[in-house]
């Protein structure tokens, strides 16, 4: 093989290596953007830049807690079917050392909120909640499900009797169901 052919092959390999390096940079940027999208879509991220280099997961519960019934498209919601798998993933990740829950919610679906609260209460890592603004209705059990709960001086919390929308049949079973839900809520408070 001539010297000219050898130089062309080396140039070709150098171009491929440069192209692979460029592709790697593009992939790394996509991964970084996906993390940003994850934060944008679900209000969750892992905080790592603190003084002790501890990995703390940030979970925000903002707006209405959405359960099986979808809220209107223009309402800010926290969807429990996104939060529950994330909580399971956090519990499974040995590198995450704690969780900070930020709350500003008007409440929402009782069953969905209680499911999230029960998952938060069962976490093996330390969990701290911070109420920013308000944590009303089903937001109260969400706030107190953590190991330590804090509220800003201007924050508010309000709990009220369970209500249902739609047609409710006035039977003993309906009353028992209301009582059961109320007891589940009171167990947290």
What are the functions of these language-model segments?
Residues 1-140, 144-189:
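N-terminal organellar transit peptides
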